[in-house]
Amino acid sequence: MLQPQFRPLLAGTASFAQTVLGRTVARCYATKAATQSASSTSTSNTSKDAKAKIVTPYVRDAGMMRTYKPHTPGIRHLKRPINDHLWKGRPYLPLTFPKKGQSKGGRNHSGRVTVRHRGGGHKRRIRMVDFERWIPGPHTVLRIEYDPGRSAHIALVKEEATGRKSYIVAADGMRAGDVVQSYRSGLPQDLLDSMGGVVDPGILAARTCWRGNCLPVSMIPVGTQIYCVGSRPDGKAVFCRSAGTYATIISKEEETREDGTKVMTGKFVNVRLQSGEIRRVSKDACATVGIASNIMHHYRQLGKAGRSRWLNIRPTVRGLAMNANDHPHGGGRGKSKGNRHPVSPWGTPAKGGYKTRRKSNVNKWVVTPRVRNMGVRRNKKTT
C-alpha cells in the first residue's frame, strides 16, 4: 500500500508545523455563519501580558502536496494536491451523461481528427455544470466532487425552496454545509426590507459579496477577486473557470452624489485577468466571488507516461521523426529536415506565422492587451 509523505510547500520546520497544525481554526465559508463556542475561544495563554494575543494563521490542506515512497518507478516523482475533502462516491447521475463516440478520440462528426493527441483514456461521464446561475434563493452545498472534465472542483448544491440539485464550479475554501446564493435575477424582498428600503452600496456589498455568491459585476466592489466571469448581460460565465484562476475588478464608471453614495453611470466594468489583460465586460454580466478551487493543480506531477494515457492524452511525436507524407519535416535518412524553416504539420511557419494580419482587427473589448513574447511582440493598438 502506498504510504503518503506530507511535505509543506512553505519553508517551515517541525516546530512550525506543531505551532500551526496544533491549533483549531474556526471555519467560516461562504454565507454560512460559523458559531464558535466559548471553550474554543479560550486558549491556554501563559504569557504575562494578557493583552498580547497570538493571531492563529489560516491553515489550508491545499497548501500541501502529497508524495509517496518510491516502491515503483511510476510513483517516484508522483505529486498530488491534498484534497481529502472530495466526495469519494459516484456523481449525481441525473446531472451527467456518458462521453462516448469518436469525439473522445479528437474526431468530428465525419471522423476526421480535429484535435490531435487525444484518445484512449478512462471512460467518463460529462457533468452538466450551471454556468448561468439564474435561480435565486439560498442553495446548500451538499458535497465537493472531482470532475474529470475540468481542472477545478465542482460543488453539488441543493435549492432550499424546491430541493432542485445542480452543479457549480466550487470556490477555493468551499465545503459541504455552506450556503451560497445567486443575486443575478435581482435582490430578494426580505433583503431590501432588512435594509430599511434604502440600498446603500457599502451595506449591500457587505450583505451579498460573500465567497461562492453569484452577482452582477456592478454590485461587486472594486478590488474584489472573482471567477466564472461573464461578458454579456444574458450570457453564461466564460472567463476564469479553470483551477486557481481569478479576475480582479479594477474600475467602474461611477459618480458620487451629494450624500456620499456612489452610483454607477456607465455600461461597462473593467476587470484584469491573470495574464495582465484588462477587458471591458457588461455591468450586468455574472461573476462569482472568490477564486476557482483546486489552486494547487499546476504543481502536480503525473510521474509516468501511463497517467497521461489515463487522462485521454496521447503522445506528441516530433515532426522530424515522422515520414515525409505525415509532416513537412519528415523523411530523409537520419535526422534531416533539409534547409527548410520550421513549419507546422500543415505548412504554416511555426515561428510567428504569416505576417498578413490587418492592424484594424482589434478586439474592442480589450482595454490593455496582455504582454506577449516578453514584450517583444508589437501591440496592434499602438502600431
Swiss-Prot record:
Pfam families to which the protein is assigned, alphabetical: Ribosomal_L2, Ribosomal_L2_C
Main location: mitochondrion
Biased composition (Basic residues): 106-122, 330-340
Summary of subunit composition and partner proteins: Component of the mitochondrial large ribosomal subunit (mt-LSU). Mature N.crassa 74S mitochondrial ribosomes consist of a small (37S) and a large (54S) subunit. The 37S small subunit contains a 16S ribosomal RNA (16S mt-rRNA) and 32 different proteins. The 54S large subunit contains a 23S rRNA (23S mt-rRNA) and 42 different proteins.
Protein's UniProt name: Large ribosomal subunit protein uL2m
GO MF, one example: transferase activity
Region described as Disordered: spans on this chain: 97-122, 322-357
SMART domains: Ribosomal_L2, Ribosomal_L2_C
GO cellular component, one term: mitochondrial large ribosomal subunit
Sorted UniProt keywords: Mitochondrion, Ribonucleoprotein, Ribosomal protein
GO annotation terms (biological process): mitochondrial translation
UniProt similarity note: Belongs to the universal ribosomal protein uL2 family.
Subcellular location: Mitochondrion
UniProt xrefs under Gene3D superfamilies: 2.30.30.30, Nucleic acid-binding proteins, Ribosomal protein L2, domain 3
UniProt-listed NCBIfam families: rplB_bact
Entry function: Component of the mitochondrial ribosome (mitoribosome), a dedicated translation machinery responsible for the synthesis of mitochondrial genome-encoded proteins, including at least some of the essential transmembrane subunits of the mitochondrial respiratory chain. The mitoribosomes are attached to the mitochondrial inner membrane and translation products are cotranslationally integrated into the membrane.
InterPro entries named among the record's database cross-references: NA-bd_OB-fold, Rib_uL2_dom2, Ribosomal_uL2, Ribosomal_uL2_bac/org-type, Ribosomal_uL2_C, Ribosomal_uL2_dom3, Ribosomal_uL2_RNA-bd_dom, Translation_prot_SH3-like_sf
